[in-house]
Amino acid sequence: MVKSADLDLMNSIISESDENFSPPPFTVEEAENSINNKSSTASLESPQNGSWHPSLYGLSVPEKTHIQNSLDLYSHGNSGSQKTHNVSFSCEIRKVKSSKLSPISNMEDSEDKKEEDESSSYKNEFKSSSSASVSSNFEKTSGSDDHNSQSPVPLNEGFEYIASSGSEDKNSDEEFAVEMILDSRMKKDGSGFQYYLKWEGYDDPSDNTWNDEEDCAGCLELIDAYWESRGGKPDLSSLIRLTRSRARSSNEASYVEKDESSNSDDSISYKRRRSRNAANRITDYVDSDLSESSMKEKQSKIEKYMKSDKSSKNFKPPFQKKSWEDLVDCVKTVQQLDNGKLIAKIKWKNGYVSTHDNIIIHQKCPLKIIEYYEAHIKFT
């Protein structure tokens, strides 16, 4: 018969063997089984379900048998004091559990803690690399954007990923494409051209913008096609020379010594007003669009008012050439249309005659038109 003192001692030994785990205490029936039954598993098995006592979860059969033998030694020992058996049994349980295998509950806690530490370490490493990558991207892209430079991050189940900076900065890195060039003009300081651009995906005319030529490096093909459709890009230096020479000749004409016989304030005022209008017309040309429509369209409009000579019906002016100075013999006439535009008829050295918008003449043969104006100027 198991005494209550012995039962308490057995339970205290098993509880002390695992400080982090509190198994159900032995019952009197279980304790008696451990004494009366000599099998290697009877004493520490639960009689309810036939499984090992919870204090021994996680131990192998040999280890459980070793503890069983210690319990038998304590219960039926023929040598040594009760205290010696007590210490021996307690030490055996502690030794086996600490050096061999931990209880399943402790093993699960340990594995959970290990996974948590690995996950925490992985998250910190990912956040560090992500922050460094975002910082590097920010320094590079004050717009340009190379999101593909970042190394791919391996997937990990159960991990809550941080949003990539690439998706957040998608709008800031959006690229704008030029759909077409609508018009062009010379800059006021004469340093180059400006182009009137229509942007792809923006159909509202208010979205069209004027941009300097040096800012249009991304649409050089459109610029080349634009000038090709207009007979070639005008020479900037010739336009500047034309502007200066026209302004100078206008100023000279306005201050020509007047004839003493017709010395009136009205005539002086008229000459100055006419020369000022001519200068303003050149200035307006420089500041305004060089081509409000293509040269071919202008040519068709001009031919409505003035037909070329029959001998020039099949003649095609060399619009691809930058200058016509060596090809044109002279400017024959200059006329003004109903809409205020000036057109000039020129004679080519090969004998052909053709009519063109005065702006084209300024671009292609400015010296010829100056010679015409000088030949027809009248002093009063």
From Swiss-Prot:
Pfam families per record: Chromo, Chromo_shadow
Biological function: Component of the kinetochore which plays a role in stabilizing microtubules and so allowing accurate chromosome segregation.
Chromo domain ranges (all copies): 176-238
GO cellular component: mating-type region heterochromatin; nucleus; pericentric heterochromatin; subtelomeric heterochromatin
Region (Disordered): 14-58, 100-156, 250-273
UniProt keyword Nucleus present: yes
InterPro entries (alphabetical): Chromo-like_dom_sf (IPR016197), Chromo/chromo_shadow_dom (IPR000953), Chromo_domain (IPR023780), Chromo_shadow_dom (IPR008251), Heterochromatin_chromo-domain (IPR051219)
Biased composition (Polar residues): 33-52
Location in the cell: Nucleus
Acidic residues bias locations: 108-119
Protein name, as recorded: Chromo domain-containing protein 2
Keywords: DNA-binding, Nucleus
Originating gene: chp2
Chief place where the protein resides: nucleus
Single annotated GO MF: DNA binding
Alphabetized PANTHER family for the sequence: CHROMOBOX PROTEIN
GO biological process: chromatin organization; heterochromatin formation; pericentric heterochromatin formation; rDNA heterochromatin formation; regulatory ncRNA-mediated heterochromatin formation; silent mating-type cassette heterochromatin formation; subtelomeric heterochromatin formation
Low complexity: bias regions: 121-140
Superkingdom, taxonomy of origin: Eukaryota
This protein's record includes keyword Transferase: no
Natural source organism: Schizosaccharomyces pombe (strain 972 / ATCC 24843)
